[in-house]
Amino acid sequence: MHILKVGFNYKTTPVDIREKFTFSEDSLQDAMVELKNQKSILEDVIISTCNRTEIYAVVDQLHTGRYYIKQFLSNWFGIEKEEFSTYLRITEDDGAMEHLFRVSTGLDSMVLGETQILGQVKQAFLNSQQVNTTGTIFNELFKQAITFGKRAHKETAIGEHAVSISYAAVELAKKIFGDLQEKHVAILGAGKMGELAAKNIQGSGATKITVVNRTLENANEMAEKFNADVESIDQLPVILQQADILISSTGADSIVVTKEMMEKVQKQRKGRALFLVDIAVPRDMDPAISELENVFLYDIDNLQHIVDDNLESRKQAAEKIELLIEEEIVTFKEWLKTLGVIPVISALRQKALTIQAETMQSIERKIPNLTDRERKVLNKHTKSIINQLLKEPVTQAKEFAGKDNAEDSLQLFINIFGIEEEVKEELVKHAKKNETLMKIAKEEPSSFPIIEKITTA
């Protein structure tokens, strides 16, 4: 058994190629089911976002797994393999696990440490569970990756430092004013940067937002998204008198807010502090405005310094997470090693309980007049004896599973307790339940296909 990651992402694949391999929400579950029906594919989860399309699969053989995943992509999207193979990035076993942990923590994201991808990984996993394309291995691996993603963000605070200009502006406003809920925020300009600033402002709790723009049609369109008010640019002096914060990104060729305009505004404000953020290039605001009392002006260069410092903080946090990822991989591989012992322990318990049940039947034949209470007491105590006798052998079996010669040790364990047939039955039951293990032929010697085929180097 092996774990594969096959896919495209923003690092290696241009958007004009990525967009051809994006699974729609409506088709994603059908795609996972279709993939699982391919030869060699035992479990699968597909993560499809604007920045990546990645297939994670448990396969019985690496070369056939790679082949059938490529063939699936070709068939599903109607594109010849030769046209996209150069863009595909494939990682195996430890590399695939590491990549998933990096994705879930935001280390592989365009914006280092962003949290949106963790929700997307979780949703992909839930989608796969709903259509039964995961089994024993991915149920454990994805739960671990999602839990680790949450823990990594909590322990390192990697996502707490703004690394975009518009978000840095909002963070700076929060440092100056604290709670933004009661503050009046004006957005000058209804372009892309203005909309992003409005989104971040609203996400930080601001409820009173005014969009100011030359073209009212564009302003109205943006305002609808954020339940904001709209004013034309000729009302800018009035808005400046009322607002606590102004974020400007008009794209104008010349200064929009002059020092002279602000001097008049400040007389009307009667000393109330005004926070101005100019993220436009060329600048919208006269730099001389910063000379005015109780006016705090920041331009894109000021914010870039904040972003650079924050990005460095995120990089330091990322280094800590990289070390934690190594520990997570070790933890998962240790779990994999114990997986092979489950059918052995189950078989041993089943044989012991069968003996206990036969013993109870023998007692009842020899002592037919047992009361219900006596029968319950005997049943309870004979099971207690079984559990006490099995405690040490079960512990030993688990220890065997963690050793390099696990398969030989477990086979010896099986022979000693005479549970060969019971183990075969447990392996078949396990395979049917999880649809992960290869079919076990009744005449074949019992084996532990999961633990030995995953690379442990």
Curated annotation (Swiss-Prot):
Substrate binds at T49, C50, N51, R52, S109, E114, T115, Q116, Q120. The gene is hemA. HAMAP family: Glu_tRNA_reductase (MF_00087). This is Glutamyl-tRNA reductase. NADP(+) binds at G189, A190, G191, K192, M193, G194. During catalysis, the active site Cys acts as a nucleophile attacking the alpha-carbonyl group of tRNA-bound glutamate with the formation of a thioester intermediate between enzyme and glutamate, and the concomitant release of tRNA(Glu). The thioester intermediate is finally reduced by direct hydride transfer from NADPH, to form the product GSA. Keywords: NADP, Oxidoreductase, Porphyrin biosynthesis. Possesses an unusual extended V-shaped dimeric structure with each monomer consisting of three distinct domains arranged along a curved 'spinal' alpha-helix. The N-terminal catalytic domain specifically recognizes the glutamate moiety of the substrate. The second domain is the NADPH-binding domain, and the third C-terminal domain is responsible for dimerization. Pathway: Porphyrin-containing compound metabolism; protoporphyrin-IX biosynthesis; 5-aminolevulinate from L-glutamyl-tRNA(Glu): step 1/2.
